[in-house]
Swiss-Prot record:
This is PAT complex subunit CCDC47. InterPro entries: CCDC47. One of its GO terms (cellular component) is rough endoplasmic reticulum membrane. The gene is Ccdc47. It is found in: Endoplasmic reticulum membrane; Rough endoplasmic reticulum membrane.
Length: 483
């Protein structure tokens, strides 16, 4: 009963409210105005929601996904209540864009996305990865060394060229007065005088002279230090050496007698005795002092026989050797000159090397490496010594006993050589015979005609039998002579 009474009270209240509402509108115009105002209120609500939505997304501390879901829910509710929602959206899109509506939107940072990111940490760059000169010290050293090598190459090459030209200028007049041809480079078929040095490389210069009595020619070689090589320059700081001038005179066979003779520093003679074939065979004794002939203690003598020493050490030669002893490395006269010893892997050569009658001179340039162009002029008296030695070698002749002794020495050297090479020569002859037999057998086997092949075999057997018979006859003759 109580419930029924409560229900009746609710109905009465609802009816009174609705009646009061419709009493306010007396005519149809008021109803239309109410309807328009009613929709206007909802339009204000939509516009307020659009303008307030960015602030809600920015200021809220919740996730962006949740805020977006709430806004979409509100829009769907509004579309369900109003049938002309699409028309209103078209009107709002046609309205001009108002910049004041979004004022301050970009000024507020979006802190929601930063919360999910890790904090930024700044790592210190190691010192060896920084862009500083200390990081390129190795490259700097390499570039500096390369520049130093290039500069030393240019300076050293130019200095050697100046020294060579200074030597040639000071000796040119003397050479042209004694030789018809000075400076032939060998490029032309006919010998022509170029009047200049021939550069072999950066530290070696050659000069060929010919056209003089009693000699075929003279080769002058200026062997300077490798000043263009930086490593060689550094090595010379520890062990100084000198520039050298080497002169080789090839004599005519009829203008020089048979003897081997050398004079020079003791150290140089010992080295030559080990390296040169003729000095090691014909001058096997140790170098002897030249004090007997008035030579300084720094010089020694190697000679095949005493007669040669007596004949070569005249007053003028002793004068040259005494006054220029500091510049003389060695003086070597030989009719058996064949160069350095021949070293073969399979043993001794099967024949004696070819020999030439030769005069060799080796002079040291003053300065011990610190040479200047003016020092090259100091070698001019030594060139006079070379010219005098050529004439001296032509005039000097051994007596009868000396000639016989020289011939015995050469026969002894040849006999020793044949003994050393006898086994090798036998092996070489045996290998040649075997090769010949092998070729003969191959020729017989390759013959297609059986009859011709048989005849070739019979001929080979007959030759073998003849050889055996000859050997037996020789053995019988030897036995008869022995009896």
């Amino acid at each position: 009963m109580k419930a029924f009474c409560a229900f009746c009270v609710v109905l009465l209240v609802f009816g009174s409210v609705s009646e009061a509402k419709f009493d306010d509108f007396e005519d149809e115009e008021d109803i239309v105005e109410y309807d328009d105002n009613d929709f206007a209120e909802f339009e204000d609500v939509v516009e307020d929601s659009v303008t307030e939505s960015p602030q809600r997304v920015i200021n809220t501390e919740d996730d962006e996904d949740e805020a977006t879901v709430e806004l979409e829910g509100q829009d769907e509710g509004q579309e369900g209540d109003f049938e002309d929602a699409d028309t209103q959206e078209g009107d709002t899109e046609s309205e001009p864009y108002d910049d004041e509506e979004f004022e301050g939107y970009e000024d507020k940072p979006d802190t929601s996305s930063n919360k999910n990111k890790d904090p930024i940490t700044i790592v210190d760059v190691p010192a060896h990865l920084q862009n500083s000169w200390e990081s390129y010290y190795l490259e700097i050293l390499m570039v500096t060394g390369l520049l130093a090598y290039i500069m030393n190459y240019i300076i050293g090459k130019n200095k050697n060229s100046r020294l060579a030209q200074a030597w040639f200028n000071s000796h040119r007049e003397l050479l042209e007065s004694n030789f018809t041809l000075v400076g032939d480079d060998g490029t032309n078929k006919e010998a022509t005088s170029t009047g200049k040095l021939n550069q072999e490389n950066e530290h070696i210069y050659n000069l060929w002279c010919s056209g003089r009595v009693c000699c075929e020619g003279m080769l002058i070689q200026l062997r300077f230090l490798k000043r263009q090589d930086l490593l060689n320059v550094l090595a010379r700081m520890m062990r100084p050496v000198s520039d050298q001038v080497q002169i080789k005179v090839t004599m005519n066979d009829e203008d020089m007698d048979t003897y081997v003779f050398a004079v020079g520093t003791r150290k140089a003679l010992l080295r030559l005795q080990k390296e040169m074939q003729d000095l090691s065979e014909f001058c096997s004794d140790k170098p002897k002092s030249g004090a007997k002939y008035g030579l300084p203690d720094s010089l020694a003598i190697l000679s095949e026989m005493g007669e040669v020493t007596e004949g070569m050490m005249d007053t003028k030669m002793v004068h040259f050797l005494t006054h220029y002893a500091d510049k003389i490395e060695s003086v070597h006269f030989s009719d058996q000159f064949s160069g350095p010893k021949i070293m073969q892997e399979e043993g001794q050569p099967l024949k004696l090397p070819d020999t030439k009658r030769t005069l060799l001179f080796t002079f040291n340039v003053p300065g011990s490496g610190n040479t200047y162009p003016k020092d090259m002029e100091a070698l001019l008296p030594l060139m006079n010594m070379v010219i005098y030695s050529i004439d001296k070698a032509k005039k000097f002749r051994l007596n009868r006993e000396g000639k016989q002794k020289a011939d015995k020495n050469r026969a002894r050297v040849e006999e020793n050589f044949l003994k050393l090479t006898h086994v090798q020569r036998q092996e070489a002859a045996q290998s040649r015979r075997e090769e010949k037999k092998r070729a003969e057998k191959e020729r017989i086997m390759n013959e297609e005609d059986p009859e011709k092949q048989r005849r070739l075999e019979e001929a080979a057997l007959r030759r073998e039998q003849k050889k055996l018979e000859k050997k037996q006859m020789k053995m019988k003759q030897i036995k008869v002579k022995a009896m």
